[in-house]
Amino acid sequence: MKPKKPYETLDPENWDEMRALAHRMVDDAITYLETVRERPVWQPIPDVIAARFDAPAPHEPVGADAVYKEFSETILPYPMGNIHPRFWGWYMGSGTVLGALADFLASIMNPNLGGGNHVANLVEDQVINWIKEMLSFPKDSSGLLVGGGSMANFVGI
């Protein structure tokens, strides 16, 4: 058993290894998006893969490399299909490289708009002002950014 650290942390044990894994993930993700047209829009999940999701909870740590390998084998190959250009199921837009990178940067900052004097409040205000301008809404009208169509409908009600 490893000796307990004087404090708990979620930081990686080795930043260089984490950096290398992160670069590999970005490279793989860009290749995945770049080659989306070479794959079917959707494919069924093989029984052997589905069975891997009926496992007991892990009780020991698993390294980030192993988790990424599991993701690459069991999750990434079997999407809904909405990032494919021939997916015509409904309005959901496709994933984009810049959208994914923007999500990554937002996740790194982990902002919230619950209060405080930080830049996320200014970003939301700016985006709302741009939308008001595009829609010719009055400058003194208000707005709110939400996470998706369901929440927008809920707020609208």
What does each model-found stretch correspond to?
Residues K2-D140:
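N-terminal entrance/gating region of PLP-dependent enzymes' catalytic architecture
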Residues E124, I128, S141-I157:
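Conserved beta-loop-alpha segment that forms the PLP phosphate-binding cup at the N-terminus of a helix
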